[in-house]
Amino acid sequence: LRELVGRVRAGLLRLGVGRGDRVVALLPNCVEALAAFLAVASLGAIWSSCSPDFGTRAVRDRFAQLEPSVLLAVDGYRYGGKAFDVRDRVQALRDEMPTLEGTVLLPYLDDGAALAGTVRWSELTAVPGSLDFDAVPFAHPLWVLYSSGTTGLPKGIVQGHGGIVVEHLKTLALHHDLGPGKRFFWFTTTGWMMWNLLISGLMVGSTVVIYDGSPAYPDLGTLWRLAEKHGVTYFGVSAPYVHACMKAGLRPMDELDMSCIRALGSTGAPLSVDGFRWVANAVGKHVQICSMSGGTDVCTAFLESAPTVPVWLGELSCAALGASVASYDASGSEVVDEVGELVLTKPMPSMPVSFWNDPDGSRLRSAYFADYPGVWRHGDWVRETTRESFVIYGRSDSTLNRGGVRMGTADFYTVVEGSDQIADSLVVDTTELGAADDGELLCFLVLVPGATLADVEPQLRQALRKELSPRHVPDRFIAVDAIPRTLNGKKCEVPVKRILAGVDPKQAVSRDALANPDSLDPFIALARH
């Protein structure tokens, strides 16, 4: 790896890359992406990456604002057993980013792939080079991550060298218990902050296990077999993946040797109580379940677990070291054992040094500090328990409001998606946006093949009334083909809510920020009636 990074560094120097230059990468989760990042960081240049499955406009909206000097890209990628050639997309990006002084093409799909006017990866890495790291100030930009961009141009979130190093050393060494001899895996793409955290495993001397492809191809057992094959110590996935394995009836421990896995990390959405039980019963009771919550904004977790902290079903075990987490009510008072806004009352090292193109800091202050002066509001509903663990209830801007009682969406999804007849769901309260005095609580369902709404609806009404409350029972259940999701797989609760409240769909959501933009059509049609 050191030799490859040295070669990439030498190649970037030949292309004129220096301190402060932006190098953008349309690369999958592969060793070349890891080496390229390390080479860019060694020069004091600024890294930014997107997954090659992002659409042209989604990538352009992110990369173009950085005015990059070099683009690193693949000819294509494979997903779910299919090949996708993205050279047309690469060329379109080159045409729309006039600041580019060079484009490097990595033949990933086809060894003979070419694109006129580009430098081949083999040319970039042809000459050996020493691996030197240029000294930079503590807050010098390391990389630019992005907000989801569902309601406008994605915000470029700039994080600094020093803050990321301090934060990731703490998280990986102390919370994840990683170090020499440990093997760290997280299923991610280069377009999600978990890739940035994953590669930081090298800092603590761990072996990083990288995987490119679908977690469900050829079946949901793929990642579990990967863990067994490579002796993964810390196995990281998203909560929806755990829930999918649970609903599919998988029991990895019955077919594979799962003794290597000491901890399972889960993030991206709240992990349900049933999800916790499934890990214990189907993967192994020796596995510490580490449910985590944080954000791209800080490229880490505020709430997570630790080797010396108890695990409670459905809860995040503790606040992260150095994270001054609290729950605030509407008046800005701290509350315990009540649901409130998740806030940070003191700085964390990896907080953004800035937003890109925000010279006076006004957009950054508006994003985090507008509600509680001097206090970071993250936008999640959280309850701190009396034993100092935490429960996440979903995004606070997608709150359900029934009879003046506020409810998060996470509990709702746990019950609804606990049904083996439901593949996915979305719940929206139109009253909250003032769409009408008699707004509705709507539940959109993606049914599994063979299931019918007529059969499912009575069961769900009964389950929600029994397991949550009568207030949680929707006014209507509506079957749809798909739930709109962001490029990183998050449910688009707020954009759908805005569309149903009468906001112009073009103002409510950027289609290019969605993984499945056509899924919006039924919601738009419903709003027009």
Name the predicted role of every residue range.
Residues 104-105, 117-146, 153, 161-168, ...:
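Conserved pre-ATP/AMP-binding loop-to-beta segment of ANL
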Residues 174, 211, 262-389, 395-399, ...:
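Conserved AMP-binding/adenylate-forming
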Residues 165-183, 193-233, 248-249:
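Conserved AMP-binding/adenylation subdomain of ANL enzymes
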